[in-house]
Every structure is written in structure tokens, then in C-alpha cells.
Amino acid sequence: MSFRSSIAAVVLGAAVFVSPLVASASAAPAGWVAAWATALQPIPDLAAPPPLYRAPDVAGRAVRQIVYPTVSGRAARIRISNAYSRAPLVVEAASLARAGEGAALAGAAVPVRFGGKASVTLAPGQELESDPVAIDVAAGRPYAISLQMGANQRMTVWHRVSNQFNYVSAPGDHVSDPGAALFRTRFTQYAWVSELAVEAGSARANVAAIGDSITDGLRSSVNRNRRWPDALARRLTASGAESIGVANLGISGNRLLSDSACYGTSMASRFERDALSRAGVKAAIVLIGINDINFAAMPPRAGLDCDHPHTQVTAASLIDGYRRLIEAAHRHGVKVFGATLTPAGLPAGREATRLEVNRWIRSGGGFDGVADFDAVLRDPARPSVLQRRYDSGDGIHPSDAGYTAMADAVPVEQLQAAVGGK
């Protein structure tokens, strides 16, 4: 099989295992809301992957992942996923606790059970929510989700860019260990855990922020929660909307219309699973399309060609993709806000496509609201590039200050109205 054919097999095979198992958020019990979430993607299945795509050894070890909920609650549950895998996922035990410094715990580890059992095995493609856990969850504080992995478990699915240090223990059962000494392996991905939901009362709601690396927070400060969805969550809290959680469902490199072996399935394919299935979701903010415009012009690469397929797009094809997202959201009773594509210093032809897409987004175009990220980030003298103070240094991804400016551009009052108030 050629490499290009193998890439297609990875992506298309993954889709077979995922799509039948998506559940609607409307089926979630009342009063539960996603306080934290991430979008998972397959790890390229290669004999000798590049360093960026090498997963740590997790067999018979505890994996401890640090998450920051955006809304408080009096009980919690986690969702684990075996999406994109061709083998079962075996979790021998799980726990949830307040996190301390590094991999250390600041509170007692509370066991997490699945159907009353400590261990669980998920079939390929299966997602599963845990039983509720009696634990007070405080928004903005770190929590550690620890999974004790099966003796032969391999990591086949992750969220590649976490901007958060997570940890793998030495071999053995360390799922409830309070100290950090045995968690010597550090990695900057999330694996298997796709959501932490809290029981927060009937008036609570979630906003799903979904996009590419700019939503993912690429090049923001590690362990500092400086992505724009983080800043939006803080802004909502400061405005008195403590009842609204924000889930970051960005995937670096993601495209609206094309799958990638490195950058996940297209948003057109993953939108319902990653955004519309979130507990308590009432609104989504969509920022996607710049990679569709840009990757088409990238030359094919030998080996792992993350930009494959190099599909040419037009403003019309992107707009058609947005309309499909809007229709899906409205079928689920979810309001959807469109975000304008941010400056990336593109050549004239690609820049013209970006500007045409932005004109459509600003005109309404079927979206329930607009977050004009382009307007706040662009250089007034050269609107095709980022303002220097908002540029992380690569001309594409914002700095911490740029991500904050993006959050400030979200129409919060309109967003609150869309989700049903504070």
C-alpha cells in the first residue's frame, strides 16, 4: 500500500468506528453541563512516527491528566472515548481529585466507577460516561483525572496539543497515589478523556468553542490557560455568568472540509460528536477554514504528509460547509456563532478567499451571531497580517494578548441570550 493510500485508510477506517456511537446532548440528564472538554484525534499508525507523533508507553501504568473546569458543581462524571481505535480500551481503575503541583494531588482521590464497576473495557469507537462522583468542583481550579491502564494498553487516540503538562507513572497501580514521585514521564497531550461534566442545576449551559489551532491555543503559554476559550470563560464569570461553561474543541491543523491523518477528521464530520453531544450545550462558536485555504497550496511531502489531501477550496465551498454546520446545530436546538478568519499573511489569491468568506460571515449568512476576530487582530495599516502585539511570532497564531483580545470580541450579551441567560 502506498503511503498516501495508508493515510486514507487511517482516516476512513477511523470514521467507521466513530460515527455510529454519537449521542445527542439533548439526551443528557437535566442539570449536567460540560465544565471541560477536548476533541480527540487518531495517532498516525506508523512503524516509525516522527517525534511529534510518538506516544508514551502507558501499558500497566497510571495516566494522570490535569483539567481546569469552567463551571462549578456539586458532583462530576467523566467521559472516556475509544474513538478511532481498532482495539479495545481497558481501564482497570479511575479516580478524580483536586490537583496540586505537577502530578501531585491536593485532595483525596475519589474512585470513579462505570456502571458500578471499577474497571471497564470499551469496544473500538465506543464512548462511555462514568457514574456520578460526589465531589465539589470549583471553576478555574485544577483537577486530576487518573486512569490505570490495562497491561497491554497502547495509546491510539489523543488530543495532540494540550498546552498542559500531563503525566504517566512508573509501572504498577498508582491511580490514587497522592504524590508526584512516581509520575516521571511528562507529555503534552490528552488521551481518552473527552469531557468532565458537573451537576450544576437546571439553569446551567455550555458553549462549545470549536476550531483549529487558533482555538486550540497553539503557541499560548503552557500550563497558564491563555487560549481564547479560557479567556472567554473568565470573561463570562466576571460578567456574572458563572452558570455558563466553555468547552475547547479546537484541533490544531483541523480543516472544515478535509480529513487528515495528523489533524483529525474534518469539522464537517466531527461537529456533531465533538460539539453537539456536549452535556448542556446551548451554543457553539465556530472558527474554521484558514487551513482549508492554506494547505491546498502546500507541496506534497514524502513520509507523513499531514496536509494531504491538498484539496483546492473556494469561498463558495467553505460557505456551503458552514451552512451544513449551522443546519446541524439548529437541528439540535443549538445556536451557532460564526467567527471571522484571522489574518495569516497569505498570498493574494488565498487572501481574497479569506476576505470573501469573512464578508459572508459578517453579513449574517445564517449564523445566529458573529465574533469578528479578524477585526480585532489585524494590523490597521496592513490588514492581511496580525498586529505585532497580538502575534506570537509565526504570523499566524496569536500571542496570549491576542487570544485575550479574541475573547473580548465575543458578543457576550448575545451569547448569554442564546443560552438562556446567566
Language-model features: locations:
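Catalytic His-Asp segment of secreted/periplasmic serine-dependent ester chemistry enzymes
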Residues: 254, 264, 294-296, 302-304, ...
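Hydrophobic/aromatic beta-strand patches that form the interior of the parallel beta-sheet core
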Residues: 208, 247, 337, 369-371
